[in-house]
């Protein structure tokens, strides 16, 4: 009986992995990086609906997950693949991108539409340490809050300053701060291998001076454009 249950679990896990792969079948890491850069540019170009400049400038890392999809076979019903970039040790410039998978959470599908883009700002070292772990859950392993919207919006409330991660989503053109409690993030080792030709960990990529691919360099250039530190 135990063996039968184990076989069932393994089979179910295989179906989930296969189905998740089918959602992104044929899409390369380079194409997804380009889409991530487009998402950032479109959001920041909105006159009164972008992420406040002050927050982006203060952030330690950013997670961009374009096109999160509804997926009934995933626990939590939602699945996405995206990238993390963190500031270099000097505090200026951005690292090569590391790949992540996102599952569960509430990404704004109530607004309508079949896909949602998400952006997460990691605001302090504690949040970065959580981000570099093998897996963590927003709201449980790291404090999270809906980020303020508007290029000149105030970022000085206690809630925003205490949160380790500020989160946003965009669906059907509507961009808003939304608390993504319950969403889990984990490394996407397959995509990292595709980009860099070896099985590097996210920590090695973000903290080890890994050279970015061409598409990764373009995303970093966009981040520098919108979040250059002046100090």
Question: What positions do the PLM features span?
Answer:
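Sec/Tat signal peptide C-region and signal peptidase I cleavage site
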Residues: 18-25
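Bacterial N-terminal signal peptides that target proteins for export
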Residues: 1-13
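Small-residue-enriched, tightly packed secondary-structure blocks
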Residues: 26-231
């Amino acid at each position: 009986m135990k063996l039968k249950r184990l076989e069932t679990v393994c089979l179910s896990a295989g179906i989930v992995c296969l189905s998740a792969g089918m959602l992104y079948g044929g899409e390369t890491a380079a194409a997804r990086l380009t889409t991530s850069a487009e998402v950032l540019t479109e959001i920041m170009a909105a006159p009164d609906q972008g992420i406040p400049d002050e927050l982006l400038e203060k952030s330690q890392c950013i997670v961009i997950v374009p096109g999160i999809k509804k997926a009934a076979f995933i626990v939590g019903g939602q699945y996405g693949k995206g990238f993390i970039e963190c500031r270099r040790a000097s505090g200026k410039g951005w690292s090569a991108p590391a790949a992540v998978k996102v599952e569960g959470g509430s990404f704004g599908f109530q607004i309508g539409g079949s896909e949602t883009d998400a952006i997460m700002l990691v605001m302090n070292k504690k949040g970065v340490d959580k981000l570099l772990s093998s897996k963590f859950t927003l709201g449980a392993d790291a404090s999270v809050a809906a980020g303020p919207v508007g290029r000149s919006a105030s970022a000085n409330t206690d809630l925003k300053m205490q949160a380790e991660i500020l989160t946003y989503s965009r669906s059907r053109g509507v961009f808003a701060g939304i608390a993504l409690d319950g969403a889990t993030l984990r490394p996407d080792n397959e995509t990292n291998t595709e980009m860099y030709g070896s099985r590097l960990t996210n920590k090695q990529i973000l903290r080890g001076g890994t050279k970015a691919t061409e598409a990764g360099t373009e995303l970093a250039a966009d981040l520098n454009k919108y979040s250059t530190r002046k100090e």
